Amino acid sequence: MHRPLVFVGMSGVGKSHLSRILGRSGYRVFDVDTRIAGELASLVTPEPGELPVYALGRWMDMPWTEGFASREAEYLALEERVTAACLDEAIASVAPAVIDTTGSVVYLSATLRARLKERGRVIYFHTPESDRVRMREQYLRDPKPVCWGGLFRRVGEETPREATERLYPELLATRDHLYRVIAEEIIEGPELRGVQAPALLARLGLNTDPR
């Protein structure tokens, strides 16, 4: 029985792209984001023509809006169920498997995070500091709903933008620490940009024929 790979890291670091490469090489891919999109009806109904990711963002809204903490908790409960199901299926899979987690996997229960670490090979694709600066500037230009794990707190008369500018680097640093806690292996995200299947399999120490 194969020990499933578990890819963790910030959104946009390349987890999904690398998972798809493995999928074309015989691996069974468990895409947590896609699974969540298929179960969004429990949280929000997309408008006609609206992509699930935008419907989720519209529903969750920004961290300074009323009720955000409650909506975040509801979302994470859904992510918990989906991620646990993916892990169970990956463990039972005859074919080798890879679980493409969301960026907020580190906010799931300690029990599930420990189980991911125990039963899977957790690989953290690290976002370098230069990319974090770019992510911060992009987020400030076009803020999108993300899970903050209780970190977002405005001080005094801070505007939402001022609080976000102050706290976003802390969000990234906190996540970096939490990813490292569960990771068995850390790979610099840019290291695998543009990589093809043989090189990816070799870098991960995987058999070129997963059967």
Please provide the spans of the model-predicted regions:
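NTP-dependent small-molecule kinase module
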Residues: H2, I21, S25, P96, ...
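A glycine- and Lys/Arg-enriched "phosphate-lid" helix/loop adjacent to the NTP-binding pocket
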Residues: E118-D176
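P-loop (Walker A) phosphate-binding loop of NTP-binding proteins
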Residues: M10-V13, L22
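ATP-dependent small-molecule kinase phosphotransfer cores
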Residues: T34-A114
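Conserved catalytic segments around the Walker B and adjacent sensor/switch elements
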Residues: Y27-V32
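Hydrophobic anchor at the beta1->P-loop junction of P-loop NTPases
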Residues: F7
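Short glycine-rich anion-binding loops that position phosphate/pyrophosphate groups of nucleotides
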Residues: G103-V106, P128-S130, L192
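Walker A/P-loop
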Residues: S16
